[in-house]
Amino acid sequence: MANMRNIILTALLSAIALVSGYVEGLDDKFTEFRQNELWLVEFYAPWCAYCHTFEPVWTEVGAELKSLGSPVNVGKIDTTAHTSIATEFNIRGYPTIKLFKGDLSFDYKGPRTKDGIIEFTNRVSGPVVRPLSSVQLFQHVMSRHDVIFVYIGGESLLKKEYYKAATEFIVHTYFFTASEEILPKAVTLQDVPAVAVFKDGTYYIYNEFIDGDLSSWINRERFLSYFQIDSYSLYQMGELSKLVALAVVDEKNPSEESIRYKTLMERVSTEYRDHYKSDFQFGYVDGNEYVNGLIMGELAMPSIIVLNMSIDGYYIPESSTETIEDLLQFLNSVLDGSTTLLGGNGFWQCAKRIFYKGKNTVMSMVETAPVFSCFVLGLPVGVVVLVIYATCTAVPADDEKPEEEATASPALDTHGKKAIESQPESTEKTSEAKKED
């Protein structure tokens, strides 16, 4: 029985060591060899609570990529031990995930899941723009991805702009090239070359005169018109010029009101797309945690809210939203400025947000790493206490002695007086001595 237990324990430890071996611990020397290979790297800190939660996921990512025969190496770096690395790559949050491809580095900003990270890795590590050579391949790609961009045509200035934009946005979505022959029969083009986005079960053609810069158009169109938005997608929308119209609901406890809010949002996103496509991104979020952090308060569920992610501002309807007309009226009031903007990035709001985030960070640190947190928080307090104690108990310097002598003058005067009174006796003795001589 004991032998069987030892065998199982040995096998378990061997499996853990084998899986952990797929993730390489890196140090400052990483900068010397990173350009020669593809690397997917996690930058973490020991005090980061989420980094500990995320560690098994990262191990799974390393094992999965290895089993798929991926050329991408997986590693991790402790930025508290290798501070120069954190400075060089401008690491500001934890965990930060970057893919290094030659001289370029790409930040992963999606959900911290194995599937999401592996999809990002496969997309970014391969060609920036991939050719679609057959109708079957086109249909296969369409079935696998919610949003794809396709360049149709031969060499042109538009193609150069397309490749440049693809390099910028490959971290978010897929880019392909195709000829007219392999497109679905339902797709009709006015001119070639052209750029199209396929999403929402249909397609939209880029028009330079209406849509403006190609890169900006791709940035606006890389999301579905209406979808479930998580905190990572919401964070990315700070890069858009759009406002984000949300139904905030609790999917675990659905209600008639929450279903109505979601339905209204979806209807507006499709039925009024041409009217609002440049101004609003529509969706819904499950839970109010991220929104609460943004507004620094508690938002009731279900609710409707419009976020301006570029300035951390938000709008809330002043009356109930019962019909699509009510929602349209609210959206129009946001655009014409008749609804009050709350929050924002003013001085006091920024100060309040810093305090709010700092408080949450400290609470998270104390909950997950109490000993380390006590050291980090107690060290500066201890230094201040020592400085105050040293100041209060300091020995007076030499230049302060005259003041002490001045305060002791009465005693000195007394002694001085006695010294003067004794002088006549010595004078008399001296005179008598002279007479005797």
From Swiss-Prot:
Catalytic activity as recorded in UniProt: Catalyzes the rearrangement of -S-S- bonds in proteins
Cytoplasmic-facing ranges: 390-437
Residues of the Thioredoxin domain: 22-126
Top class in the EC scheme: isomerase
Region Disordered, annotated ranges: 398-437
GO cellular component labels: cell surface; endoplasmic reticulum; endoplasmic reticulum membrane
Annotated PROSITE patterns: THIOREDOXIN_1, THIOREDOXIN_2
Protein name per the record: Protein disulfide-isomerase tmx3a
Organism whose genome encodes this protein: Danio rerio
